[in-house]
UniProtKB/Swiss-Prot annotation:
It is an enzyme of class 1 (oxidoreductase). The gene is pdxB. The lineage of its organism: Bacteria, Pseudomonadati, Pseudomonadota, Gammaproteobacteria, Enterobacterales. This is Erythronate-4-phosphate dehydrogenase. The active site is at R208, E237, H254 (proton donor). Keywords: Cytoplasm, NAD, Oxidoreductase, Pyridoxine biosynthesis.
Length: 378
């Protein structure tokens, strides 16, 4: 059995070798010749999986180690009798922590408290729900918009997008990309929406590039609209609008979900799905794969305020480390993908063991996802 895996899927070679012969290949572009005798294909979001790629090939199963699936023609796979699995929620924690890293940087730079801001969350799936929970643990007001879930009667106080635009100081997008249909998200943030944002608002897109109309956004910023922007995703990736990058406050190369834990979850989820597909079901404990974190433990004295939280968050991950490299190479062919391929190891907050002498600080840090314990001072 021959299994092709994206060369940037951590632990894929070791795991899938339990099931067959493994060949690691680049994800963009996939070397088509390798598909001629392969039984399974494991990809990431950079690989477009459709009829033109797989028609006439012996592939029986496709797995994507990503939460999103808009790069996969699921309808055609089903029609062709090809098994499929994604990894929903695998990188949700990573994306939430990316948003926090960005907001805490902007708050420090611009001198505001997040408690003074209302956060509008557009898309309340795996990422949106986790973001809401962590923000509300800090006492930060959130407004939720998710028409599909609202129409299904899902639990939640869902508002219209217009209401979020009117009342939110921070608007962050966490939707799939739907190019048509009743819940279309292509250019959901169009020129009208962008111009309607509150003066000084913060706009964040860490889902799919085309959810925000990049041309309209550049127009508004070029005309001097007072708006802070965080973009991790771009229309036309791996190409991006260099002029837009110059205007945004934080720009990164589609790496919001790129924690080691998130990647490992994605790999293990599709590995477990494929093992079940072929009748040799196996399960993997994530902590058996991950290395020891860079920082073993730290001690925190006193209560948890915003500056202290910012220091802890940026000790684990400071978004500026990914902004600067992109600005240096933007516009050079191939460099966007190279930044992603050679991405520095990044961990999640849970990797940081925090010893607190303040019980409320320990409790709050645990709610936020840190590995915190209370040890009273002696």
């Amino acid at each position: 059995m021959k299994i092709l895996v994206d060369e940037n899927m951590p632990y894929a070679r070791d795991l899938f070798s339990r099931l067959g012969e493994v060949t690691a290949v680049p994800g963009r572009p996939i070397p088509v010749a390798q598909l001629a005798d392969a039984d399974a294909l494991m990809v990431r979001s950079v690989t477009k999986v459709n009829e033109s790629l797989l028609a006439g090939k012996p592939i029986k199963f496709v797995g994507t180690a990503t939460a999103g699936t808009d790069h996969v023609d699921e309808a055609w796979l089903k029609q062709a009798g090809i098994g499929f699995s994604a990894a929903p929620g695998c990188n949700a924690i990573a994306v939430v922590e990316y948003v926090f890293s960005s907001l805490l940087m902007l708050a420090e730079r611009d001198g505001f408290s997040l408690h003074e801001r209302t956060v509008g969350i557009v898309g309340v799936g795996n990422v949106g729900r986790r973001l809401q929970a962590r923000l509300e643990a800090l006492g930060i007001k959130t407004l939720l918009c998710d028409p599909p879930r609202a129409d299904r009667g899902d639990e939640g106080d869902f508002r219209s997008l217009d209401e979020l635009v009117q009342h939110a100081d921070i608007l962050t997008f966490h939707t799939p990309l739907f190019k048509d249909g009743p819940y279309k998200t292509l250019h959901l943030a169009d020129e009208k929406l962008i111009r309607s944002l509150k003066p000084g608002a913060i706009l964040i897109n860490a889902c799919r590039g085309a959810v925000v109309d990049n041309t309209a956004l550049l127009t508004c910023l070029s005309e001097g609209q007072k708006l802070s922007v965080v973009l991790d995703v771009w229309e036309g990736e791996p190409e991006l609008n260099v002029e837009l990058l110059k205007k945004v406050d934080i720009g990164t190369p589609h790496i919001a979900g790129y924690t080691l834990e998130g990647k490992a979850r994605g790999t293990t989820q599709v590995f477990e799905a494929y093992s079940k597909f072929i009748g040799h079901e196996q399960h993997v404990a994530l902590d058996t794969l991950l290395p020891a974190p860079e920082f073993g433990r730290i001690t925190l004295h006193g209560p948890l305020d915003q500056p202290t939280l910012k220091r802890l968050v940026h000790l684990v991950y400071d978004v500026r480390r990914d902004d600067a490299p992109l600005r240096k190479v933007a516009g050079i062919p191939g460099e966007f993908d190279k930044l992603r391929k050679n991405y520095l190891e990044r961990r999640e907050w849970s990797s940081l063991y925090v010893i607190c002498d303040d019980a409320s600080a320990a409790s709050l840090l645990c709610k936020l996802g840190f590995n915190a314990v209370h040890h009273p001072a002696r």
